[in-house]
């Protein structure tokens, strides 16, 4: 994964810098998201791996599949990525682009997993507290996992806060073992 990220980084950075300079971050994010989804299609993956298909043919086919969703600059970007045989890296490129975009917008995606469904009021309160703690706008994504028994697990980038009963039991069990 780290190697793929290293290979994808220059493309993501170039796309981000272009999109930022032209105030098109949302458009490019959507375009790269579509490109990532198309590149993960089984039929498209077979075509991308086919040794007899040239990079120009791969780019042209890719652009045709995406239709009018790509402007001229985006099509050129796909051609450059294809020339360097990096179309399979589009999911990583899109992910890095979105990280750069979030950093620019001072926002962060936060995944909150709870044992029981959180109502909208609880989600809003949690988002407000996390926003104050992280110093960023928080986009909250809530999920349920009954195996937590109670409490929540919060993931925001590299930060993980495990306030679940399952996590506390695991820590207690580890302490008893040592």
From Swiss-Prot:
One GO CC term, this protein: proton-transporting ATP synthase complex
Pfam families: OSCP
InterPro entries reported in the protein's UniProt record: ATP_synth_OSCP/delta_N_sf, ATPase_OSCP/dsu
Main location: membrane
SUPFAM superfamilies: N-terminal domain of the delta subunit of the F1F0-ATP synthase (SSF47928)
GO molecular function: proton-transporting ATP synthase activity, rotational mechanism
Membrane topology per record: Peripheral membrane protein
Keyword list, A-Z: ATP synthesis, Cell inner membrane, Cell membrane, CF(1), Hydrogen ion transport, Ion transport, Membrane, Transport
Superkingdom of the organism of origin: Bacteria
Assigned protein family: Belongs to the ATPase delta chain family.
Entries under NCBIfam families matching the protein: ATP_synt_delta, PRK05758.2-2
Subunit note: F-type ATPases have 2 components, F(1) - the catalytic core - and F(0) - the membrane proton channel. F(1) has five subunits: alpha(3), beta(3), gamma(1), delta(1), epsilon(1). F(0) has three main subunits: a(1), b(2) and c(10-14). The alpha and beta chains form an alternating ring which encloses part of the gamma chain. F(1) is attached to F(0) by a central stalk formed by the gamma and epsilon chains, while a peripheral stalk is formed by the delta and b chains.
Xref: HAMAP family: ATP_synth_delta_bact
Function, as annotated: F(1)F(0) ATP synthase produces ATP from ADP in the presence of a proton or sodium gradient. F-type ATPases consist of two structural domains, F(1) containing the extramembraneous catalytic core and F(0) containing the membrane proton channel, linked together by a central stalk and a peripheral stalk. During catalysis, ATP synthesis in the catalytic domain of F(1) is coupled via a rotary mechanism of the central stalk subunits to proton translocation. This protein is part of the stalk that links CF(0) to CF(1). It either transmits conformational changes from CF(0) to CF(1) or is implicated in proton conduction.
Name under which the protein is recorded: ATP synthase subunit delta
Species lineage: Bacteria, Pseudomonadati, Pseudomonadota, Gammaproteobacteria, Pseudomonadales
Gene (name only): atpH
């Amino acid at each position: 994964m780290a190697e793929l990220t290293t290979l994808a980084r220059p493309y993501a950075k170039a796309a981000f810098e272009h999109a930022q300079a032209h105030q098109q971050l949302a458009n490019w994010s959507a375009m790269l998201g579509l490109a990532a989804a198309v590149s993960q299609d089984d039929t498209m993956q077979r075509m991308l791996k086919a040794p007899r298909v040239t990079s120009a043919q791969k780019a042209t086919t890719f652009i045709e599949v995406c239709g009018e969703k790509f402007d001229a600059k985006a099509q050129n970007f796909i051609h450059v990525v294809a020339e360097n045989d990096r179309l399979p890296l589009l999911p990583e490129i899109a992910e890095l682009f979105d990280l750069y975009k979030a950093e620019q917008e001072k926002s962060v995606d936060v995944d909150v997993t709870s044992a029981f469904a959180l109502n909208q009021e609880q989600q809003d309160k949690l988002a407000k507290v996390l926003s104050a703690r992280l110093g960023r706008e928080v986009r909250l994504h809530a999920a349920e996992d009954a195996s937590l028994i109670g409490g929540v697990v919060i993931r925001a980038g590299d930060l993980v806060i495990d306030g679940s009963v399952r996590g506390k039991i695991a820590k207690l069990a580890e302490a008893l073992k040592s």
